[in-house]
Structure formats: structure tokens, C-alpha cells
A protein has these predicted regions:
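Positively charged, solvent-exposed patches that mediate nucleic-acid binding
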Residues: 1-122
Length: 122
């Protein structure tokens, strides 16, 4: 698959939150919505509750690295937003990748589904 693009506009994030499906676990929350561009676009959100800027940026780097490992398994045409939770700060890239794989499988972005709760947004 081609390299992913980054979600940058607030309207893109809001549309993904509002219309997309979500999957969550203690480490990460994932929102996914089909897009019309045929390109994978991702956004990463880290709130101030996670810690100072150094910790938030570390979380973003780890999430990006974990997604790069799964990028080849994902099909294009999705907007995906990853929301870091408090436990993300203390986890390694492999733990986040495992969590991400389960969630993306449950949302239908990749072909694996392994016991993750999926909520459909109205």
C-alpha cells in the first residue's frame, strides 16, 4: 500500500468522530470512517491529561511507529483517528501495535477481529 497521509483539518477529525465506528481498550481508542479519496489518512490525538509535551510527543511517535508496522495490511480509503489514553504513556510500541491490530481488525480496516468492542456512531 502507498504511504498514508495525515489528517490535519478539524472538520476531518470531527467527521471521523461523528460518523465513524469506534473501538477501544485501556491503551488506545480508534475511530475509523471510509473516505472517498482511496487513500489512508490518519490522525493522532493526545490530550494534556497524558502529561507534558515531551510525553505527548513520545506517545505520538510510538503510535506512528506502530501504525507503520501495520500499514501494509490495511486497505486504502479510510480516515483513522487514534486517541491516546493514559496507559499509552507507559506502553511499548509492540503493545500499542497489538492493541491497534485488534481494533483495526474489529473495525474492518484489516482482516483480523479479536474481541474488541465496536460502537457504531449515529
Amino acid at each position: 500500500m502507498a504511504e498514508y497521509q495525515t489528517l490535519k483539518l478539524n472538520s476531518d477529525f470531527r467527521r471521523t468522530y461523528g460518523r465513524g465506528k469506534s473501538a477501544a481498550d485501556p491503551v488506545l481508542v480508534t475511530y475509523a470512517l471510509r473516505n472517498r479519496y482511496g487513500v489512508m489518512r490518519i490522525g493522532i490525538t493526545t490530550g494534556k491529561k497524558l502529561g507534558n509535551a515531551v510525553e505527548r510527543n513520545r506517545c505520538r511517535r510510538i503510535i506512528r511507529a506502530a501504525f507503520r508496522q501495520l500499514e501494509g495490511e490495511c486497505c486504502g480509503g479510510w480516515d483513522i483517528v487514534f486517541v491516546a489514553r493514559h496507559k499509552t504513556v507507559s506502553r511499548k510500541s509492540t503493545d500499542i501495535e497489538r492493541s491497534m491490530r485488534k481494533q483495526l481488525g474489529a473495525l474492518g480496516v484489516i482482516g483480523i477481529s479479536a474481541g474488541v468492542k465496536v460502537a457504531q456512531r449515529k
